[in-house]
């Protein structure tokens, strides 16, 4: 039998797998168990009461977290003219059209988010096989295809997270860093939950928020008692 690591033993001792923790207790646990030599991210998994096989029950969108994610986000914008100037002024690292597309085709993708104005989709559409598998393809539902590219850049820089149900109907995203204040992690999680509730498909029946779990990059999931979250009550 494989020997448990010190961290695995600590998780086994501290985390009750069948318990739903008060959000403040859950965050305190994450902080206690975050023993990696780097600042771990705080991730969330939300099990939704949807049938992901049905297109009218897919949940997809974006929301700006009040305290950001703790990451420096590099933004690429496909646009031209006045929009290009506005995107640059808003802080985008890469702005262009065909020349930017050529960089992507050459494998030069030093960015985390891609935004496009509607008139640029003729160029971006050619990059679907490259951007799509990486989760970078712009989409109107996530606010990354928009005539107001400057606002989209500001949102990305401010800590916007994009979410989408996976094949099991689960949303996975990051809501901060383990060195955030506990209240900041809680408020970021509540902002995400509030956005998900607003995005509930009309076709989804029964309990929508089935389970909420938070974890750190190297840690185990801790189930959260939803009644302790303001936007999940």
Swiss-Prot record:
Q: Does the keyword RNA-binding apply?
A: yes
One of its GO biological process terms is: translation
Which Gene Ontology CC terms are recorded?
cytosolic large ribosomal subunit
Q: Name one Pfam family in it.
A: Ribosomal_L1
Which InterPro entries did the record assign?
Answer: Ribosom_uL1_bac-type, Ribosomal_uL1, Ribosomal_uL1-like, Ribosomal_uL1/biogenesis, Ribosomal_uL1_3-a/b-sand, Ribosomal_uL1_CS
The GO terms describing molecular function are: rRNA binding; structural constituent of ribosome; tRNA binding
Give UniProt keywords alphabetically: Repressor, Ribonucleoprotein, Ribosomal protein, RNA-binding, rRNA-binding, Translation regulation, tRNA-binding
Recorded family membership: Belongs to the universal ribosomal protein uL1 family.
Q: What's the subunit arrangement here? A: Part of the 50S ribosomal subunit.
**Function per UniProt:** Binds directly to 23S rRNA. The L1 stalk is quite mobile in the ribosome, and is involved in E site tRNA release.
HAMAP family named among the record's database cross-references? Ribosomal_uL1_B (MF_01318_B)
Q: What is this protein called?
A: Large ribosomal subunit protein uL1
Q: Which organism is it from?
A: Shewanella sediminis (strain HAW-EB3)
Lineage per the UniProt record: Bacteria, Pseudomonadati, Pseudomonadota, Gammaproteobacteria, Alteromonadales
């Amino acid at each position: 039998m494989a020997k448990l690591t010190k961290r695995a033993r600590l998780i086994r001792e501290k985390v009750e797998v069948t318990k739903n923790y008060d959000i403040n207790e859950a965050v305190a646990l994450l902080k206690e168990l975050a023993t990696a030599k780097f600042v771990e991210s705080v991730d969330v998994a939300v099990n939704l009461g949807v049938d992901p096989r049905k297109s009218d029950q897919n949940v997809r969108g974006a929301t700006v977290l009040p305290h950001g994610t703790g990451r420096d986000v590099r933004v690429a914008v496909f646009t031209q003219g006045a929009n290009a100037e506005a995107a640059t002024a808003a802080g985008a690292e890469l702005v262009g059209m065909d020349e930017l597309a050529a960089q992507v085709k050459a494998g030069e993708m030093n960015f985390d988010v891609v935004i496009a104005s509607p008139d640029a989709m003729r160029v971006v559409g050619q990059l679907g096989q490259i951007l799509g598998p990486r989760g970078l393809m712009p989409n109107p539902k996530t606010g990354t295809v928009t005539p107001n590219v400057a606002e989209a850049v500001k949102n990305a820089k401010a800590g916007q997270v994009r979410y989408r149900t996976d094949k099991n109907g689960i949303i996975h995203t990051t809501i901060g860093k383990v060195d955030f204040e506990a209240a900041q992690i809680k408020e970021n999680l509540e902002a995400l939950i509030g956005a998900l509730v607003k995005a509930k498909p009309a076709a989804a029946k029964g309990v929508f928020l089935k389970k909420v779990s938070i974890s750190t990059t190297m840690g185990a999931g801790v189930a959260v008692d939803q009644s302790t979250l303001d936007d999940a009550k």
